[in-house]
Structures are given as C-alpha cells and as structure tokens.
Amino acid sequence: TNYGIGTHLADTVGDPAECQRIIRERAEKWAKEFDANSLYILYRAGIGSDMTPLAGDIKAPLLNVLADTDSVVDVALSQPTVDLLKSKGVDAEFHEIKTRYGHAGPMIDAGLWADRLRTFLDRTP
C-alpha cells in the first residue's frame, strides 16, 4: 500500500487474512471518526496553492521527518522546502529515514529518529 501499513502488518502479523482484518477494522474505525470534509479541504489547499509568500509567517520550529520510501509525499521536495523556510527566518530542519514502511515509516520506525527528535525538542523553546 502507499502508506506502508500493509507491509508492516505482513512483517509483524504474517497471516494475510489477519492483516486484511486489521486493515479493515482500522479503516472502519477511521471512517466513523474522521470528517471527510477535512480531506476535501486539505486536497483543495494543496492543489495550485503557493504558500511561499506566507512561509515567513511560520513561528513554530519545524522538524520535517520523511521516509525514503514515501510514495505519498515526495521526499525530494523536503530539503528545498526546509531551505526556503530557513531563508524566510523559520527554524526548520529535515531528516530522512530509511524504512520499508513508506508514508507511515516515521511513525512505525520512530526509533530511527528518536535521538534527532530529542535533540530538536531539547533546543526548542
């Protein structure tokens, strides 16, 4: 899958039928709790929107962590984005992790960047 959950379940659960059951259970729970209008708004905001003029308005420090296998967010755009934010005075940094788990990799393999997060939080006011 694009998000890496199927790969993670295959690695940890093994049984394909059980993996499918878990995915369906999670999807049904998500669908009951999540407002689909939020996806529409996020989609509209991301299509044809140039936020560059507002980049300097960001006040919170940013640690952007992406997986090298992410097929949802293009990891190649991350460093240029962080460089742009820095040029606007934003405290931003990028960290790429190597994981099999795609878009969900930074959550599933959080241990791969835990030290980086700890350092980031320790220096963040």
Give the ranges of each region predicted by the language model.
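Alpha/beta-hydrolase
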Residues: T1-L63
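Predominant activation on well-ordered alpha-helical scaffold segments within soluble catalytic domains
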Residues: N37-Y43, Q79-V82, R118
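Conserved strand-to-loop "acid loop" that flanks and positions the catalytic carboxylate
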Residues: N64-D70
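Conserved active-site and cofactor/substrate-binding residues in soluble primary-metabolism enzymes
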Residues: F34-N37, A76, L112
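Catalytic active-site module of serine/aspartate enzymes centered on a nucleophile-bearing elbow/loop
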Residues: V82, K86-P125
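Conserved alpha/beta-hydrolase "acid-adjacent" motif
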Residues: S71-P80
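Structural recognition of the beta-strand scaffold that forms the well-ordered cores
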Residues: L63-N64, E96
